[in-house]
Amino acid sequence: MARIAGVNIPTAKRVPIALTYITGIGNTSAKQICEAVGIDPSRRVNELSDAEVLAVREHIDANYTVEGDLRREVQMNVKRLMDLGCYRGLRHRRNLPVRGQRTHTNARTRKGPAKAIAGKKK
C-alpha cells in the first residue's frame, strides 16, 4: 500500500485514479503529475517502484496543497470572510446560500430541515 500525503492510496487501481483519493488532487492534476514524473497513466500502483512512488510524493509536496493544509486554508478563507463582515461572510455566518441562490423556496440543505409554523396548516 503506497502512502502519499498521509493517504493510503489503493494499489490495484491505475495511478491517476489512485491519486484522486488524495484531497486536493482531481483527474486533471493526477494526469499532470503522472506526466511530470514520467509515469505511464495505464500502469497500476502496485507496479510502481519505490523510487517512482517517492518521485510522485516529492512532486505533490513541492507543487500542490493537499489534505489537511488545503482544508485549513479553505477554513481560514471562510473565517476571513466572516471576520470582514462582507456579504459572503454574513451568508456563511447565517448558514444561508452564499452564491446568490434563491431562499424563498429551496436551499433546504444549507438551511436545515423545515421548521413547523403554528397555524400554517389549512
UniProtKB/Swiss-Prot annotation:
The keyword RNA-binding applies. SUPFAM superfamilies: S13-like H2TH domain. Residues 98-122 are annotated as: Disordered. GO terms for molecular function: rRNA binding; structural constituent of ribosome; tRNA binding. Keywords: Ribonucleoprotein, Ribosomal protein, RNA-binding, rRNA-binding, tRNA-binding. Coiled coil: none annotated. InterPro entries: Rbsml_uS13_C, Ribosomal_uS13, Ribosomal_uS13-like_H2TH, Ribosomal_uS13_bac-type, Ribosomal_uS13_CS. Belongs to the universal ribosomal protein uS13 family. Located at the top of the head of the 30S subunit, it contacts several helices of the 16S rRNA. In the 70S ribosome it contacts the 23S rRNA (bridge B1a) and protein L5 of the 50S subunit (bridge B1b), connecting the 2 subunits; these bridges are implicated in subunit movement. Contacts the tRNAs in the A and P-sites. This is Small ribosomal subunit protein uS13. The lineage of its organism: Bacteria, Pseudomonadati, Pseudomonadota, Alphaproteobacteria, Rhodobacterales.
